[in-house]
Each structure stands twice: as structure tokens, then as C-alpha cells.
């Protein structure tokens, strides 16, 4: 959960590298990334267009439809598939390694809780 943004960045960079030889597709991809980043990094104030309030879910839906439409029009699917396939092993290996260390932290936390419960119960019984 913590590394979700990092995983997305890895996929975006691998897609970006796979599109270096297709400058039109790359520029479209960069424009879409900027649009998505703007949607997620802006303030939570709703947009007002022609007197109508546009909420975030509508904005995300419009951007999603626009993204899919542009991907279909520019035939960028091959570059995206190559980029995702290049980034997938990195993310999977990291996910497997991180899971093992996460389990160690869970075990350490459990041991600390048991030690704290034992010490608190011995303090309460001695008073």
C-alpha cells in the first residue's frame, strides 16, 4: 500500500522509455500524465464551468474516457504493453522481497506487544 505510488512511477518510466522512438506517442503520453497529475494534485475545490459545478468523479471519468480515446487514436497500445511488461518484473520482485520484510516487522511488533503486556501485568500484580 505504501509503495503504490512508487510502483506507478516505475510503470510510467518504463512506458516512457519504451516510447522514446515514437515521439508523437511520447508527447501524447506526457500530456496525459500531466493532466492526471494535475487532477490528483490540485486543491479539492470543485471546478465551475458555465455555471455548473463539476465534481471530481465526473472529472476523472472524462479524463479516463479521453485517455482511452487518445490511446486508441494514436495506436499507442504496443508501447504501453512493452512498457508494462518491462516494469512488471521489477515491481513483482520488489513486492516479493518487501512482503518477507513486512512479515518480520509484524513478528517483531507482536513480540513487543507480548513483552509490553507481560511487563504491564507484572507491574499491576506487584502493586
UniProtKB/Swiss-Prot annotation:
It is a multi-pass membrane protein. InterPro entries: Prenylated_rab_accept_PRA1. GO terms for biological process: vesicle-mediated transport. The chain crosses the membrane at residues 15-35, 53-73, 76-96. Keywords: Endoplasmic reticulum, Membrane, Transmembrane, Transmembrane helix, Transport. It is found in: Endoplasmic reticulum membrane. One of its GO terms (cellular component) is endoplasmic reticulum membrane. Coiled coil: none annotated. Its main location: endoplasmic reticulum. Belongs to the PRA1 family. May be involved in both secretory and endocytic intracellular trafficking in the endosomal/prevacuolar compartments. PANTHER family: PRA1 FAMILY PROTEIN C, PRENYLATED RAB ACCEPTOR 1-RELATED. This is PRA1 family protein C. The lineage of its organism: Eukaryota, Viridiplantae, Streptophyta, Embryophyta, Tracheophyta.
